[in-house]
């Protein structure tokens, strides 16, 4: 009866531990969503892997890609996918997130994966993400009592004693952890803080071997010892950043350059820090500087490559388009050279300036409008006759002065064939109708009719037609008809 009562209680405890573990992991996953979205710089192969393993639907996959095509930042798209994973969160989600392909494609996920290992001090819950079975790792959290119950068919009393011993060990370990926190806080303020951190790193490296994590305790004392070793030094080595500060500034004078190089020596900084756990445990951090050999002042430093680690990548495509437009505008200006706008002089390049000045200095090379040959004038011409010879283009004739006085609509010009023309018709006959200025088109001995009118040789003809008198016979007939 005791054995039958113990097995349901152990199963409920196992379920409670599993639920507690998943809740802690989910809580830590929520806090790390922004960091994960910032670490994943491209959608491939992250979104494709989620779709292939049916963590997201095909429709949602297409929606995420459409948002990327609409110039939405990649980190916001990844954050939206992580919100979908949060709804279906379990250990398989973490296994898919930190698989080998993603770790190789996104190296920044290594630090985030290590932070999940610090959720529990013993780090046993996170080993399933590295390729093991999550269920087998969860069995380690149950304590040695579960292994005894599975190994012995009728060991109910052993199960109870083992579970009680496991609870007592947890109490001891919690007390030891509080004592270690106070000691670490005191050592962090003491001058020998670096030595203590180096000792903790060595102990942690010795305890973090796969053998110590994979072997199950065979008895209660072995379990207490293993748990104590894992909890006494939970600090782990984390390579945060390696910075190389180069001093490549050349100052005037040898003394200034020497002082500058002595102050700004190259250094490599390695930070040893511990991840923050959900239990509120803050461990000591230490930095060790390894100075390198100072470079001579006359040596040139190679250009350092900087990678933009900004979270917002919305400017990736739009900024590239703007830069291309600026480049094309600059190239176009360089190709066209300097120019004049509204009589505002712009500095010209030497090549353009010499060409422009040389062209302006040589009048023969300038392009200008070609003018036809001038019609010679007769200075001492006689305009006393009744008829004057006139010319308009290819047409030639004689102008009758008396008829010209009557008006412009009178046929006062007689051609060579004997045909009579008005001044406007004679202009059309000489193929100068486009000018529409017969006073300027028709000439007499080289002088235009306008000039002859101004000199008084010809009288300016009236523009109106002369009314012809009515026939008296027709007027009488009209009166009689009335």
From Swiss-Prot:
Domain notes: The HSR domain is important for the nuclear body targeting as well as for the dimerization. Contains one Pro-Xaa-Val-Xaa-Leu (PxVxL) motif, which is required for interaction with chromoshadow domains. This motif requires additional residues -7, -6, +4 and +5 of the central Val which contact the chromoshadow domain.
Comp. bias intervals (Polar residues): 147-160, 250-264, 274-292
Keywords noted in UniProt: Cytoplasm, DNA-binding, Isopeptide bond, Nucleus, Phosphoprotein, Transcription, Transcription regulation, Ubl conjugation
Residue stretches of biased makeup (Basic residues): 322-334
PROSITE patterns attached to this UniProt entry: HSR, SAND
Cross-link (Glycyl lysine isopeptide (Lys-Gly) (interchain with G-Cter in SUMO)): 243
Protein name (Swiss-Prot/TrEMBL): Nuclear autoantigen Sp-100
Stretches for region Disordered: 136-170, 250-334, 357-381, 455-482
Additional note from the record: Sp100 is a single-copy gene. A related gene, D1LUB1/Sp100-rs, occurs in multiple copies and forms a conspicuous cluster in the chromosome 1. Sp100 and D1LUB1/Sp100-rs are homologous from the promoter up to a position in intron 3, but they differ 3' of that position.
First-listed, main subcellular location of the protein, grouped into a coarse class: nucleus
PTM-bearing positions, type Phosphoserine: 174, 190, 314, 318-319
Chain positions of motif PxVxL motif: 230-243
Free-text description of this protein's post-translational modifications in UniProt: Sumoylated. Sumoylated with SUMO1. Sumoylation depends on a functional nuclear localization signal but is not necessary for nuclear import or nuclear body targeting. Sumoylation may stabilize the interaction with CBX5.
All residue ranges annotated as the SAND domain in the record: 378-459
A single BP term in Gene Ontology: telomere maintenance
UniProt keyword annotation of Transferase present: no
Keyword DNA-binding: yes
Origin: domain of life: Eukaryota
Transmembrane segments: none
GO MF term (any one): DNA binding
């Amino acid at each position: 009866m005791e054995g039958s009562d113990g097995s349901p209680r152990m199963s409920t405890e196992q379920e409670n531990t599993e639920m507690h573990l998943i809740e802690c992991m989910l809580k830590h996953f929520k806090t790390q969503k922004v960091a994960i979205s910032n670490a994943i710089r491209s959608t491939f192969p992250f979104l494709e892997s989620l779709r292939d393993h049916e963590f997201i639907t095909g429709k949602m996959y297409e929606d995420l890609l459409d948002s990327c095509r609409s110039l939405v930042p990649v980190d916001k798209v990844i954050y939206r996918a992580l919100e979908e994973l949060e709804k279906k969160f379990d250990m398989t989600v973490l296994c898919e997130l930190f698989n080998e392909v993603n770790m190789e494609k996104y190296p920044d996920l290594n630090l985030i994966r290590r932070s999940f290992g610090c959720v529990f001090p013993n780090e046993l819950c996170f080993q399933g993400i590295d390729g093991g079975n999550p269920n087998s790792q969860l069995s380690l959290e149950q304590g040695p009592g579960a292994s005894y119950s599975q190994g012995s068919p009728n060991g109910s009393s052993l199960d109870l004693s083992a579970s009680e011993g496991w609870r007592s060990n947890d109490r001891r370990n919690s007390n030891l952890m509080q004592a270690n926190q106070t000691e670490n806080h005191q050592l962090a303020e003491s001058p020998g803080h670096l030595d203590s951190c180096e000792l903790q790193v060595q102990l942690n490296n010795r305890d973090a071997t796969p053998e110590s994590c994979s072997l199950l305790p065979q008895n209660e004392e072995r379990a207490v010892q293993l748990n104590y070793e894992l909890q006494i030094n939970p600090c782990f080595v984390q390579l945060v950043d390696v910075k190389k500060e180069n001093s490549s500034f050349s100052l005037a004078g040898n003394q200034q350059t020497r002082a500058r190089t002595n102050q700004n020596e190259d250094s490599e900084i390695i930070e040893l820090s511990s991840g923050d756990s959900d239990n509120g445990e803050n461990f000591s951090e230490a930095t060790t500087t390894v100075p390198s050999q100072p470079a001579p002042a006359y040596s040139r430093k190679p250009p350092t490559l900087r990678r933009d680690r900004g979270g917002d990548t919305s400017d990736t495509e739009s900024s590239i388009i703007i830069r291309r437009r600026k480049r094309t505008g600059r190239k176009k200006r360089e190709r066209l050279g300097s120019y004049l706008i509204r009589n505002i002089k712009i500095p010209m390049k030497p090549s353009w300036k010499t060409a422009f000045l040389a062209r302006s200095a040589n009048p023969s090379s300038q392009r200008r409008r070609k003018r036809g040959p001038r019609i010679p004038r007769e200075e001492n011409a006689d305009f006393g006759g009744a008829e004057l010879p006139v010319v308009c283009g290819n047409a030639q004739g004689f102008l009758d002065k008396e008829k010209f006085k009557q008006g412009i609509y009178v046929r006062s010009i007689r051609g060579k064939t004997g045909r009579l023309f008005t001044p406007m018709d004679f202009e059309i006959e000489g193929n100068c109708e486009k000018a529409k200025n017969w006073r300027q088109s028709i000439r007499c001995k080289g002088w235009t009719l306008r000039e002859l009118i101004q000199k008084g040789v010809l009288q300016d003809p009236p523009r109106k037609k002369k009314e012809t008198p009515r026939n008296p016979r027709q007027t009488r007939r009209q009166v009689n008809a009335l």
